[in-house]
Amino acid sequence: DLPFSVKLPNALDPHLRIRDYGVGMTEDVVYDVYINYMKSDKTDTNSETGCFGIGSKTPLAYADQFNITTYNDGTMTMYALVKSEDGVPELNEFGSWDTQEDNGVEISFSVKEDDFNKFSNRAVEVYKYFNTRPEVSGNGDFAYPERKDIISGDTWRISKGSYSDNTVVVMGNVAYPVDVWQFEYDSKERGFLHNNAVIEVPIGDLNVAPSREALEYNEHTLKGISKAIDRVMAEIADSIGVRFAKANSWWQAKAIQREIVREIKGIGSIEELSMFNGRSLDDYPELY
């Protein structure tokens, strides 16, 4: 996928600019999407993030207006969506010009100087979970944190952390911390969720609040989280079996067992997975 670009606000240009390189938006689509609340072009699909019909207007939560620039087959058109005195959005079209830019859309708005660092820090937190990260400019200090994975699969990973760390699920590139208190104290879910883990799930497997800031913890979401954890735990069990198979002695197998217990939380009975030469490690002397 061709990454979209993000220009962070700075002293030379205080605008946040987000530019994609998709199919662009025709005039009819612009008016349809930006004037109608609860209007979405993603209502009937789980292949893209969206469907509530309010995401396109979210810049108005910060600014009184924002700019929309569309690029369609050699034509650039500029619009501004303005919040009127009564709170109703008004779309103003400035005009169209010839361009050699690739098709796509750019959204931009002015950011207060005191908020420059907040936008940069938030960009790190949001984009670090993206499968295809954007090309970020405007801040020479922008960098993603180094990640030290303990164990991982194609759609999940567990990194070094503390007991206070909790699991995050990622759906449609959006990360949602999972509330451990939604599960019973002695449940397998709650035990696992204390890992510093990231699990990707398909769009539609969980329900989210309209704000997209949190999960909606109904029966569908709880079952979806439980299903995702079961999948990860099964893969971890397979991986642990491979690690024990590499042990050259029961002493080394015991050391592997302790390392696993220290690194990974809530994976069930580690004793059931701890084997050496086909025998449970419980049959061997304790390692001191």
Residue ranges of predicted features:
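GHKL/Histidine-kinase-like ATPase module
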Residues: 91-94, 117-234, 255-288
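Conserved beta-strand-loop-beta-strand hairpin that lines the nucleotide-binding pocket
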Residues: 1-44
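Flexible helix-coil linker/hinge segments at domain or subdomain boundaries
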Residues: 230-244
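GHKL-type ATPase core
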Residues: 45-154
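A generic structural motif
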Residues: 21-22, 109-115, 207, 214
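Conserved structured core elements
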Residues: 12, 24-31, 52-53, 57, ...
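Intrinsically disordered, low-complexity terminal/linker regions enriched in Pro/Ser/Gly
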Residues: 246-257
